[in-house]
Regions:
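Transmembrane-helix signature of polytopic, membrane-embedded enzymes
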Residues: 101-117, 121, 145-168, 203-209
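Interfacial juxtamembrane loops and adjacent helix segments
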Residues: 66, 73-135, 338-343, 350, ...
Length: 538
């Protein structure tokens, strides 16, 4: 029988439907692996490609290029943040040189100052090595985000769709593809949330190891940026809930040892990182340079004696170096400005206030932007998640009727309340910080992730309570994934430093202004003769 002319098209459509049907009806374990791998592939494509664009330092890279140069030379130093993130950057640079990248580029002068002008970069410098570790950590974060939602909702396809909130989040992409610290902090924070889910409302198989893993991940996150300390609240919620349900003396003793394992692991990793920082940088700072003079002024005598080879490495040396590091960070914090044109009010962060243009370049006809703008669809869903969580938690207090799925419903609501409490504490804590120093929208990244988790969990609860939502769950999830991806693609030129005309830029300002389209002036600012001093933005 001769096939009709349109048979190939219909055959392809049928094959596509069959594939989707097999995927949807695959056994749960297979589907989890397939979709988890797809999340990693998408994250690699979004975060790891074209890392040398723009081929200029932007935002805090102006600080971190100088910090990593001193790491490369093994010079003792202090910074505005703990040392772990800089160690990862240094590892990326050294790995790059193993492959010949930047091997013949003279970068020595970068270590003489604490900050360079973003346009004063060695000729031929490739940014891929210093940015690669951050991008790879972002890929790990994508997988962790998928696993967290899988743990919350228990369904692979649902976890995959909501993990797109991370994979296609333009704000995460533009910031995590750069040589910034936030990707490392974010990865360890997500790891701590995943481990916490194995402790909250259930008995772990190896409780002391599980709680210790939570403390270790909190410690790693803290050793990138200190505001991660607020995540300890999750561990406190697990311990507090266990004590609330069982007041017996044996249970108090169990929770004491679990809390001790959290604290012990945290202190162990902090001690280890500071020890490595001392060991990796055995050379005294060059006091003839601005950076060296500033670092030397913050160092204690015991640490100076070690650097001068007058004493061996010992706990006293590590302690003195750590105390000096703390004093340096504290001084930097108290010296922060409280307002700045790119700064934002933490109370407005859930509304994406406000985006930052890290850099723009004009070629005479078109302009390329590195613009820290979020995916509006994602942020809208995050805002819905926060509001829905507040409403559902309030209704729970008045809705005590028994249902066939009462046990699963209780677990979902307990997790929702814990995550909502964590979000509120994180948000209020940063509102408080905003009184004392300038804050930026990327400081909200952990809170944004928590809002996405709230949205995913609220969807699960609503699907269980509302039959209409449950019947059309697949269609709703497919529609969400299309909207998320389409919004990401629309704003991608601002994310990836792609050249656009001013008209194309203005399209991104409909219906509200999200980016100031450049050039606003005909001539760019002149290159300064020497780096201009500035306060740390991080």
């Amino acid at each position: 029988m001769t096939p009709a002319p349109n048979m190939p098209a219909s055959s392809f459509a049928q094959k596509a439907r069959d594939f989707v049907d097999r995927l949807w009806n695959a056994d749960d374990k297979t589907l989890r692996w397939i979709l988890g791998a797809l999340v990693v592939v998408l994250a690699c494509f979004n975060f790891v490609r074209d890392l040398d664009n723009p081929a200029h330092a932007f935002w805090d890279e102006s600080y971190y290029l100088t910090t990593t140069q001193r790491y490369e030379e093994g010079k003792a130093q202090y910074a505005s943040h703990p040392p772990l993130g800089f160690m990862f950057m240094d590892a990326g640079i050294k790995t790059g040189k193993m492959f010949g990248i930047n091997k013949n580029v003279d970068t020595h002068f970068l270590g003489d100052v604490k900050k360079i002008d973003s346009r004063v970069v060695p000729k031929g410098y490739d940014f891929t090595p210093i940015r690669m570790p951050s991008a790879l950590f972002a890929v790990i974060s994508a997988l962790l985000f998928y696993l967290i939602i899988l743990r919350l909702n228990g369904e692979a396809f649902e976890a995959f769709v909501f993990s797109l909130l991370f994979v296609f989040e333009n704000a995460y992409i533009v910031h995590f593809r750069a040589a910034h610290l936030d990707s490392y902090q974010f990865t360890f924070t997500l790891g701590s949330i995943l481990v916490w889910l194995y402790t909250f409302g259930r008995e772990p198989k190896r409780p002391l190891l599980t709680y210790a893993a939570f403390g270790l991940l909190c410690g790693l996150s803290f050793m990138v940026k200190v505001n991660s300390l607020v995540m300890f609240l999750l561990g406190a919620l697990s311990l507090g809930r266990a004590l609330w349900l069982d007041h017996s003396r044996p249970n108090w003793l169990r929770q004491f040892w679990r809390g001790s394992s959290i604290a012990g692991a945290f202190l162990a990793v902090v001690t280890l990182i500071f020890t490595l920082h001392v060991v990796f940088n055995p050379n005294a700072p060059d006091t003839k340079t601005k950076a060296g003079a500033r670092d030397n002024g913050a160092m204690g005598q015991v640490y100076k004696d070690y650097l001068a080879h007058k004493r061996d490495l010992s706990p006293a040396v590590v302690w003195d170096a750590t105390v000096g590091y703390y004093k340096y960070m504290k001084y930097d914090f108290t010296g922060e400005v409280k307002t700045e044109p790119n700064g934002s009010q933490p109370v407005l962060w859930p509304f994406m206030a406000k985006a930052i243009t890290y850099r723009w370049d004009f070629d005479g006809k078109k302009t390329a932007y590195t613009h820290m703008l979020g995916n509006p669809i994602n942020w809208g869903l995050g805002l819905v998640g926060i509001a829905a969580a507040a409403v559902l938690i309030s209704r729970r207090r008045f809705d005590r009727k028994e249902t066939p799925d009462a046990e699963a419903r209780t677990v979902d609501f307990d997790r929702l309340e814990a995550l909502f409490a964590m979000f509120m504490v994180f948000w209020v804590f940063h509102i408080y910080l905003g009184i004392h120093r300038v804050m930026y929208i990327y400081h909200y990244f952990i809170g944004l992730a928590l809002s996405y988790l709230l949205a995913a969990l609220c969807f699960r609860i609503l699907a269980r309570q509302i039959p209409l939502v449950n019947r059309h769950r697949f269609s709703i999830l497919c529609g969400l994934s299309v909207l998320i991806a389409a919004s990401y693609l629309f704003y991608a030129p601002l994310t990836y430093h792609q050249y656009m005309t001013k008209t194309e830029c203005n399209w991104r300002n409909i219906p509200v202004t999200l980016v100031v389209c450049q050039p606003a002036k005909k001539k760019p600012a002149a290159l300064p003769a020497k780096p201009s001093p500035s306060l740390n933005k991080s």
